[in-house]
Amino acid sequence: MMLLQRPKSYPDESLESFFIRVANKNGYNDVHWFLVAVKRYLLDIDPRKFQTFPTDICCINPYSSKKHSISRTHALHHLSQLTFNEPVDLLGIALNRNQMQFSPSTTALIRGAEVIPRSLLRKGAIPCCPCCLGEHGYASYRWHFSGYEYCHEHNVKLIERCSCGAIYDYRYAGLSGVCTECGENISASQENHEPKATRIASWLAGDDVKPLPDVPLSYRWGFMHWWSQISSSCKTRNNGEFLAFWEHWPNSFHKLIGKEIDFNFEYCVLSKNDLRVKDILGKILFSSIQLPDRNFRSNIILKEMFQYIETHLWDDNGKLANLRMNMLEICVLLNCSREQVTSMIEQGLLPPNRQLGKREILIVTEYAFYLGDVYCLWLSEFQSDEFNRSFYLSRW
């Protein structure tokens, strides 16, 4: 297979956009038929390895593979040679699966060095910025993720419909910006301009935007994911509240935690002695741990969560300290294994809240520990260079 035109990829370009540009430059108006030709070429090289190579542009990223993405990664290596691109450049704009997780249990995607929660990946049509298509001729990967609702460069809302009402998804309609239904150029609406949404988009693009935190990009996406979890909303759209939250940080977070605790204590169905961490703090605590990791330097949400717990642990006769935990929750909180927890019990470092039989083995789901004991264990044994008390008590 010979490609006469070999465009280079752009750093913020989506993989789908790059394939569309390569197809168009080499005489294919429809990227589907280009992918059919590419698959035929790959099958001639190795029929078994490339049998699952997709001809649907929406499935071209390695993460889309149902079982594993190795064959698609190999395919991208071959295509980088065809287009005279360095493999690292082409693989760098692809969305891959990643072993990291965003709390409480969201898988991660990785693009270059940027880790993004899969929960933010759009499932329907991908909106676009008509100005970007007209000026740059390619699509940004950020358009694929909710939270990025406005183009930070042109200050216009991303659109997914032409003024005629037809859906415009660049993956199928192309990068020309021309509606396939009415033949007119799509245009950005100047109405309902939201400066706050534009500021969030600029922040997600890497700009320093006050009052939003100056943290690495992966954490910015993580904080958007976290906000969608704790605000009980399917979409991270309340831009005013999100900005106000950071405007008054960290008091806004302490107030949010206190409100959650008071509400859960007031409406709990269990007796006070049987209350668990997940009943009172679970929603906020366990959604804050991996964003995408627990490094206090950048995961300032988790840092403030621990600050709040330490400050209020023994308030009201230890109502937080006496919350119950099970072994699985301890593993999450301390970032350790069940075997380590078992060893700490045997050494007397972590006392259960009841007397164990001589050869009794605790069930991992039994709420046999107190938060106060677990927190004190963290203080004495489990602090690390990036996950330690000095980050929020440096004045000492």
Walk through the language-model features, giving the residues of each.
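Basic, alpha-helical nucleic-acid-binding regions used in initiation and control of genome expression
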Residues: 1-396
